[in-house]
């Protein structure tokens, strides 16, 4: 295992990482887009920078990294792109509007890219975990510390990683990982007005 630190929002850092990967392994079979940040708080109380930061890291960075990786993936063995989204890519909730917007964007882009690359044999998969126990909440943008302390993950990062490997092995186009997540998504689809009313209690 080798780790390279870098800012994926910068073109130069993305290119440097790809050059290093090419020098070490000469190609890419699987790209996992998992870098992300979030924010908690009402939209009307947030700064413009909060939305831009979240979108840069959670949407534009993985999109542009994927663009750079495509030449290698086209030559890869059972090539796949795994985009780590969220349950909130399927059903938005209050006080996380920027994060929901970024994850909805990732999901839409993934669906389009999946069809575009299908004939080339490159799988595009979408993994949608619920809240995960990780250092994610240590880097929330423009968020009240009290909100951070209330953010408790329901699934370990190790378990999410295991399910990600399973999705890759099975070429599972989309996985919502938790029972609670699937319940929220289906409630939003079947009973949208009721779901809105229930969620508004947390706004």
Label every PLM stretch briefly.
Residues 86:
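Residue(s) in the substrate-gating loop at a strand-loop-helix junction
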Residues 119-179, 197:
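SDR active-site lid
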Residues 42-43, 47-52:
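Substrate-binding pocket helix/loop in short-chain dehydrogenase/reductase
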Residues 44, 93-97:
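Active-site loop immediately N-terminal to the catalytic Tyr-X3-Lys motif
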Residues 5-16, 48:
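The beta1-alpha1 cofactor-binding region of Rossmann-like NAD(H)/NADP(H)-dependent oxidoreductases
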Residues 66, 102:
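Active-site helix of classical SDR
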